Amino acid sequence: MPIAKFKSPSSHELLSKPLNTIEHEMRSTGTSGLPSISRRCSDTVDTAVVAIYAMYREFLGISKGAGLYVCPSTEEIPEMGMIKALNMLAGLLDTHRFMVKQERFVPEDALAQLQSWENKFTRHIIGPPFLIHRLLQFLQQTGRRIKLDKGSMVITLGGWKRFTGQMISRREFNLMCEEYLGLAPNGVRDIYALVESNVMAIDDEHQIKHVSPYVHFTVRDMNDLSREVPDGEKGVLGILDPLALATPGMILTEDIVSLVPGASPSGRSGQRMEYIMRAPSSLEFGCCAVNLEKKMDGTEAEEAACPVVN
């Protein structure tokens, strides 16, 4: 099933279970402004929650600490898939704070919160790359540095392309984390996920993404979707998701990826993937993080243009 079907007005036709069995509805809105709507029945939610926490434990190993969420809370945007997935991590932490409120992010407040947790908790920074990059740029521009803790992580989800089309360099991002947060590259973990699927691919300590063992990735020839390409070759990603009990279990995404050949240096088995780009034919070039950035930048521009009346 082409993933674009989830954006159509007839997306309810994808359901293989009655609407009264649907427990949860999740959305992701990219640059087109059209929401992709994914509905999950109770059985899917039950198994997906267990599966996602298993992935978090395997690749992040978090069971305590403090989470600085550089993103809005689920209270503000309860239906956004990216926020929902990141918020699940909060259940493994001792405490957490959301630093984006009413579409505004104040880096000074985020830094003050990190400093208040110093010597009390292992501090983790969690959010989409563009917002964590803003925090890093603030540290760079003000000449400030902080030293995170042993076991600290920067955890990203939401894609590396900004709404302007500009890419955030992963290499530059890693170097900035090392320079301004005192965090080695193996402490930076990126997550690939789709609201339309229950898949989650998380970086290991070598920054290679491991695919959830309960799904199967198939990479298809870009010129002939009936043909599967060998590992190491790029193509269009298809996902077989047996946890999707109310929606199609096989979807064709608009992402270009490759499967990493050979054995994993981490010793883990299973599929590993490298994300390359969004397909040129796609009407979207980003996910909900891109739309969030666009809205936040619009809010900041409106505030800057508003005259102060004494």
PLM region descriptions:
Residues 1-73, 79-82, 91, 103-104, ...:
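Nucleotide 5′-phosphate-binding alpha/beta core
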Residues 65, 88-310:
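Active-site glycine/GP-rich loop and adjacent strand/helix microenvironment
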Residues 74-75, 196:
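Conserved nucleotide-binding/hydrolysis micro-motifs of P-loop NTPases
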